[in-house]
Amino acid sequence: MTTLPHAGHLLERARWAARAYADYDAVTVSAIVTAVADAGYAEAERLATAAVTETGMGIAADKVVKNRARSRGILDYYRGADFVSPRVDTARKIIEIPRPAGVVLAVTPATNPVCTVYSTVILALMTRNAVVVAPDPLAQNCSADAARTLADAAVKAGAPDGIVQVIDESSNSLVEALMADERTDVVAATGVAGAGPGNVPVFVDASADIAAAARRIVDSKAFDNSVSCTNESVLVAEESITGALCSAMTRHGAHILDVDAARRLRAFMFADGHLNADVVGRDATWIAARAGLRVTPDTRVLVAPFEHVMAEEMLAHVKMSPVLGMTTVSDDARGIRAARAVVLIGGAAHSAAVHSENPSLITDFAAQMPVPRVSVNVGNSTGSAASEVSLQPQGLISWTRIAYDSDVGVAMPNFAGITPWRTPGGPVPRYPHASNDQRTAPLPQRNGHPIGITEAPAGIEGHDH
């Protein structure tokens, strides 16, 4: 088990690496990021299989897609973006110099244990930050494997030793201590309390292409057994098209439950009023069998009807599994209100989806959803894929502004191409000590005691877990 003092040494090593990396120029940083993305892409299949084997959650083939999207996919998305070189605004006579945050603590989830490591590490390196990965204990091995794969690639490409590290054995108290430690500059927490679960509604109105909507919704809900926060949670359908929609979804692998079957499923999934963690990321057939339901072996999604969207209706809550709640409404206005209610139950500030050919309806729907992203006529786990990466490069840098006199008569020199950063020469910087168990310098003191997590914060015991 990683101890508090040892974790403190990881942070010290990360700070050392961050200081060295902060002086790298844009060309060198780009080469390092490319090498890391390529390494992640090359191991996408192996690590996807490892993730499903270790956690029992999700579908390996779908995790391969995610791993590739979070490696070279992120690289392609930000291709041409420069978060290293100074920005020169000659019209406003302002030069902005980017400064990295420093050390990023990446708290990664068991539901997406590899792709989250990929995206956080790549975005951190893109902005010249160091990363310490704290895996969910349920996915310790595959997350650590992913982190070490990227760390090796980064150092081989010229990054400082220790730029990416991983906690060997994590625990809640250890992570809380790391989050509170002053040597941690940014906490990238995914899949933990405070990170914001998604409770995504999808509304299908009478104008929608029913066949296309059915296929997209089932495919999206079934994707990776719905462990992503962007997967649809509750289907809101207009009564006039509900029959056709259900028939079409059945052709794509959905099983529509009757009222009694939905009751039994609800009782199994929410026996004590909370989601049964055993269902997270499991196959629809696995869930059905344990709920006492008979379905065909090719069932991909269970659709569970209920009457009203309200907090007391557990099927209107986040389910993290291929179980889709469904309610019907008589018209567009009621559909929008029902979808909004779903969001407010557990997914405010996340995403929503609508299938419609009515521009007015789409606009009204988007305006009334308390979310930053609305997907239209697409599976939400695809249409809002970027929303799964809550961390953005802009959140990992700050800008120092150099401002000249705004008087047009006062000239500003030509700053084009000038940068304070360097192309490193010679061997890759190595950490002064090979072992993390050796401190390179004494910790700063406060009232005679070391500052940091070598002494546990209040309420957290400083012993092995």
Enumerate the predicted regions with their spans.
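Short hydrophobic/charged patches on amphipathic alpha-helices used for structural packing
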Residues: 175-176, 214, 336, 363
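N-terminal Rossmann-like NAD(P)+-binding subdomain of aldehyde/semialdehyde dehydrogenases
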Residues: 1-95, 123, 251, 442-459, ...
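ALDH superfamily catalytic-core signature
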Residues: 192-310
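Conserved C-terminal structural/oligomerization subdomain of aldehyde/semialdehyde dehydrogenase
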Residues: 22, 293-452, 456-465
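Short beta-strand/turn micro-motifs at beta-sheet edges
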Residues: 5-6, 92-94, 120-121, 222-223, ...
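Short, flexible turn/loop "capping" segments at secondary-structure junctions
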Residues: 10-12, 194-196, 224-229, 313-320, ...
